[in-house]
């Protein structure tokens, strides 16, 4: 507890949320609307999933489903939810086992292990379905285990309804017209979108999914490079009725935009942020959106993707550098 006059957080969980918004200025050619990015890259562990790491564990504790030091937490993850859970598990004293497709970045593996999590890699061709299946197998053999089920857990969208949505409404003084959010579990777009539409039913909600795995648009699941979205199935927590439209973005478009955001806006973001930005720009370029305000969620920090295709060419260049005499 901070003394009077001090502003010191009681523990790391108190630092979650209240992330800033910033206008995009250099990548918005041809836009009729303004675009403001919600920087979830500024969470304690650098992603929007810090929110649900907190909410799912806290919710399970309040319901008496888990106990620190006794319960073993298990979760399938593409990485960022795992990190959100791992720092929470470390702070609260839980053993955590995570199942993750082997295609996810090396940084994710290292960070998860740094927090003490046990990591089980699954066949990348099976995507998140493979990770979910492995988590179920482990839980069936392990007493005192509990799967948090981010794709089905109501505590996922609930935290966005209680925090992310109100934060956007407050920061924009209620002037937000459009929300653009990538869809992984669907928790962010569902909780945030529900809150915003309750404040103003005219607000439009746009989801983003990979062109290569456009399930929500009626396509087939497939491999793609946009880590964190496009799980290959319709998540249970996603309320598709909130979506006014789903925008498809290719992996190449997402990667290119993520690079441009670093070079032109000074924002080092992940590939899914690039995808969300591409979608937001497309929506902002529509004549009917002239003068409106688009808020786009940037879910994660770019440093988590240094070993991925996003920085492949820069990594090679950096590795081949030699010192000057």
UniProtKB/Swiss-Prot annotation:
The gene is RCS3. Pathway: Amino-acid biosynthesis; L-cysteine biosynthesis; L-cysteine from L-serine: step 2/2. The modification N6-(pyridoxal phosphate)lysine is found at residue 49. GO terms for cellular component: cytoplasm. It catalyses: O-acetyl-L-serine + hydrogen sulfide = L-cysteine + acetate. Gene3D superfamilies: 3.40.50.1100. PROSITE patterns: CYS_SYNTHASE. GO terms for molecular function: cysteine synthase activity. It comes from Oryza sativa subsp. japonica. This is Cysteine synthase. Signal peptide: none annotated. Homodimer. It is found in: Cytoplasm. Its cofactor is pyridoxal 5'-phosphate. Pfam families: PALP (PF00291). It comes from the Eukaryota. One of its GO terms (biological process) is cysteine biosynthetic process from serine.
């Amino acid at each position: 507890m901070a003394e009077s006059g001090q502003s010191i957080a009681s523990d790391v969980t108190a630092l979650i949320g209240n992330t800033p918004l910033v206008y995009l200025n250099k990548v918005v050619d041809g836009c009729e609307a303004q675009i403001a990015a919600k920087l979830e890259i500024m969470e304690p562990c650098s992603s929007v999933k810090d929110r649900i790491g907190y909410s799912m564990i806290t919710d399970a504790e309040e319901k008496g489903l888990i106990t620190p030091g006794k319960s073993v937490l298990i979760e399938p993850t593409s990485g960022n939810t795992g990190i959100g859970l791992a720092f929470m598990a470390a702070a609260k004293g839980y053993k955590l086992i995570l199942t993750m497709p082997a295609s996810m970045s090396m940084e994710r593996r290292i960070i998860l292990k740094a927090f003490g999590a046990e990591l089980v890699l699954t066949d990348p061709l099976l995507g998140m379905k493979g990770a979910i299946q492995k988590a179920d197998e482990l839980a069936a053999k392990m007493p005192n285990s509990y799967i948090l089920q981010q794709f089905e857990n109501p505590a996922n969208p609930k935290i966005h309804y209680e925090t992310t949505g109100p934060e956007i409404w407050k920061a924009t003084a209620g002037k937000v017209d459009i929300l653009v959010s990538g869809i992984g579990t669907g928790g962010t777009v569902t909780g945030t979108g529900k809150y915003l539409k309750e404040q103003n039913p005219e607000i439009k909600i746009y989801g983003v999914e990979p062109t290569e795995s456009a399930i929500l648009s009626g396509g087939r699941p497939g491999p793609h490079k946009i880590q964190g979205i496009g799980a290959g199935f319709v998540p249970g927590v996603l309320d598709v009725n909130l979506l006014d439209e789903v925008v498809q973005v290719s992996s190449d478009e997402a990667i290119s935009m993520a690079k441009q955001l670093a070079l032109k806006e000074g924002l080092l973001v992940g590939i899914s942020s690039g995808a969300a930005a591409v979608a937001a720009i497309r929506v902002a370029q529509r004549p009917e959106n002239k003068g409106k305000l688009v808020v786009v969620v940037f879910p994660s920090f770019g440093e988590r993707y240094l070993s991925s295709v996003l920085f492949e060419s820069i990594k090679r260049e950096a590795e081949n550098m030699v010192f000057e005499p």
